[in-house]
C-alpha cells in the first residue's frame, strides 16, 4: 500500500536550515528512528529538534514505537514557553490538528488550549524562521511558486 504522504514530497532537493550542529545531528538521527520517511515525520523531527529542551525530552513527547504524540508532555515541569511552542507546532504539523485540546474536559480550557496553536501565538518568538522551515518540509508542494501549476489554471489567481 502506498503512503500518500510519500507522494507529497517535492522531488527537488531542499536546503534545510539548522540552529546548531546538535540540532542537525538530532534531526538526522531521529529520522532513522521514526516509522516512515514521509513529510509528516520529517516535519516532526525537524520541529522537535529546534529547542535543546525538546531534544533532551524527545521520549516524553513522542513514542517512536507506536508513532503517537504524548500530549501530556505539555504539563511536565521541564517545559518552557518556548518549548511548548515547539511541541505544539510539531504536533500540529504531524497530526494536522490540535491533539492536546482533548486533554481538557471543560470547554473553556479546550478553547484556551486551541488558541495556543494559532499562528500569532506560535510565531511570536525567535523560533519563527525555523517554524517556517518546518512548514516548508511538511508542505513542499505549496512552499514554492510553481509556474507550471499556475499556467494550468490559465495564469489567473
Predicted regions and their residues:
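Extended, charge-biased low-complexity segments
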Residues: 1-84, 88-91, 95-157
Amino acid at each position: 500500500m502506498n503512503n500518500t504522504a510519500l507522494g507529497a514530497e517535492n522531488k527537488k532537493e531542499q536546503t534545510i536550515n539548522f540552529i546548531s550542529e546538535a540540532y542537525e545531528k538530532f534531526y538526522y538521527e531521529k529520522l532513522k528512528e521514526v516509522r516512515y520517511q514521509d513529510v509528516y515525520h520529517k516535519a516532526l523531527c525537524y520541529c522537535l529538534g529546534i529547542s535543546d529542551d525538546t531534544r533532551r525530552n524527545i521520549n516524553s513527547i513522542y513514542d517512536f514505537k507506536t508513532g503517537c504524540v504524548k500530549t501530556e508532555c505539555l504539563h511536565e515541569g521541564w517545559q518552557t514557553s518556548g518549548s511548548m511552542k515547539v511541541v505544539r507546532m510539531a504536533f500540529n504539523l504531524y497530526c494536522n490538528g490540535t491533539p492536546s485540546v482533548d486533554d481538557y474536559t471543560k470547554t473553556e480550557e479546550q478553547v484556551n488550549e486551541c488558541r495556543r496553536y494559532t499562528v500569532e501565538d506560535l510565531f511570536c518568538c525567535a523560533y519563527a524562521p525555523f517554524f517556517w522551515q518546518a512548514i516548508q518540509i511538511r508542505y513542499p508542494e505549496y512552499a514554492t511558486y510553481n509556474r507550471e501549476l499556475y499556467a494550468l489554471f490559465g495564469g489567473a489567481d
